[in-house]
């Protein structure tokens, strides 16, 4: 199954997202696989058996969001220099969203840009992070504040890699699936309410529908000038949760789930979402074993973090909110007191 990326406003950038068993990959240039010890332990030998290249290197970096930094990117760059990679060389991102983001960003920097491909191994990266060309790293001010839009040459999604994924990581990926359904497709939401994702065929169908939705958005708006910003539902709040907890307490998808609950509370306050709809979304998140509670220690500090969000501009915060299930609205003129009153509801767990 192939989902095409054909960027509407960018000349000559097209590539395929292949959802199937990993094919044999043959290259006529130097190739470096960037991965982490966890993925390497389970799947590296399988990947290497599928690659033919005149020179093949493996670069292993530490596992975890806390290592998604400029320092780690510099480590990868130095390895490429050590192995005398050139502008025709290729990187392969083999791992989850952290590996994909850092590998893509490294590819954008090395000698002003070399090719890379994505082979995602987590549900979150298969349905979301590997699709669309967002790359980057975190710093002490916030998440993904340093980065670039840099498209891969191809994406290969093999659901078989998910068989070794811990249940918590799997749930984190489901958060991004629910996000897309709430924003764009009520029928898909209803499908997810009853879907058994432990069934391989149901899971493959879920991956397909999610990738098609993401590709549909990216094809219209590569650089988040419009509709692509809607994919940040849950992220404005979720990124603050991640930052406040040092990127070590919650997986990204878990923080997004909490952020969705917070965004829903604001949407209910503004009359965009009914209480019953908010409860249904929360129930679906809980069905996926995702956290839906977070205690805000200081509402003022939490609010100030919003201004470090990439979507904020001219001292205005853009909130991505559901307008019913299957609809969305971007709102940037909400009075500070309204937002803070909603945040106060999370000073004690709801």
From Swiss-Prot:
Subcellular localization(s) per the UniProt record: Cytoplasm
EC number: 4.2.3.4
Pathway: Metabolic intermediate biosynthesis; chorismate biosynthesis; chorismate from D-erythrose 4-phosphate and phosphoenolpyruvate: step 2/7
Main location: cytoplasm
Keyword line: Amino-acid biosynthesis, Aromatic amino acid biosynthesis, Cobalt, Cytoplasm, Lyase, Metal-binding, NAD, Nucleotide-binding, Zinc
Enzyme type, top EC level: lyase
Catalytic activity: 7-phospho-2-dehydro-3-deoxy-D-arabino-heptonate = 3-dehydroquinate + phosphate
Positions of NAD(+) binding: 63-68, 97-101, 121-122, 134, 143, 161-164
Residues annotated to bind Zn(2+): 176, 235, 252
Cofactor note: Binds 1 divalent metal cation per subunit. Can use either Co(2+) or Zn(2+).
Pfam families recorded: DHQ_synthase (PF01761), DHQS_C (PF24621)
Domain of life: Bacteria
Cofactor(s) needed by this chain: Co(2+); Zn(2+); NAD(+)
Cellular-component GO terms for this entry: cytoplasm
Molecular function in Gene Ontology: 3-dehydroquinate synthase activity; metal ion binding; nucleotide binding
GO annotation, biological process: amino acid biosynthetic process; aromatic amino acid family biosynthetic process; chorismate biosynthetic process
Family: Belongs to the sugar phosphate cyclases superfamily. Dehydroquinate synthase family.
Protein name in the entry: 3-dehydroquinate synthase
Organism: Sulfurovum sp. (strain NBC37-1)
């Amino acid at each position: 199954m192939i989902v095409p990326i054909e960027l509407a406003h960018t000349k000559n950038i097209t590539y395929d997202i292949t959802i199937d068993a990993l094919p044999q990959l043959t290259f006529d240039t130097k190739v470096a696989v960037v991965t982490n010890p966890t993925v390497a332990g389970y799947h590296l030998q399988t990947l290497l058996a599928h690659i033919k290249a005149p020179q093949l290197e493996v670069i292993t970096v530490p596992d975890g969001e806390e290592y998604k930094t400029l320092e780690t990117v510099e480590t990868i760059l130095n390895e490429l220099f050590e192995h005398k990679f050139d502008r025709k060389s290729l990187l392969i991102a083999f791992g989850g969203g952290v590996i994909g983001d850092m590998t893509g960003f490294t590819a954008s920097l090395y000698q002003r840009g070399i090719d890379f491909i994505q082979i995602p191994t987590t549900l979150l990266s298969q349905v979301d992070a590997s699709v669309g060309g967002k790359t980057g790293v975190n710093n002490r001010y916030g998440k993904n504040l340093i980065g670039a839009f840099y498209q891969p040459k191809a994406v290969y999604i093999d659901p078989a890699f998910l068989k070794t994924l811990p249940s918590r990581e799997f749930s984190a990926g489901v958060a991004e699936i629910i996000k897309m359904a709430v924003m764009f497709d009520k029928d898909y939401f209803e499908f997810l309410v009853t879907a058994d994702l432990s069934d391989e065929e149901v899971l493959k169908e879920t991956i397909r529908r999610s990738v098609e939705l993401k590709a549909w958005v990216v094809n219209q708006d590569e650089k988040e000038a419009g509709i692509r910003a809607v994919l940040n539902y849950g992220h404005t709040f979720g990124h603050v949760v991640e930052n406040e907890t040092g990127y070590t307490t919650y997986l990204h998808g878990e923080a997004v789930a909490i952020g969705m609950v917070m965004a829903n509370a604001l949407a209910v306050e503004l009359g965009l979402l009914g209480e019953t709809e908010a409860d249904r979304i929360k129930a679906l998140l809980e069905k996926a074993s995702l956290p839906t509670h977070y205690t805000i220690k200081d509402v003022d500090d939490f609010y100030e973090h919003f201004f470090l969000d990439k979507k904020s501009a001219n001292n205005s915060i853009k909130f991505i909110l559901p307008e019913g299930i299957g609809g969305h609205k971007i709102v940037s003129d909400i009075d500070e007191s309204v937002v803070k009153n909603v945040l106060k509801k999370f000073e004690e767990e709801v």
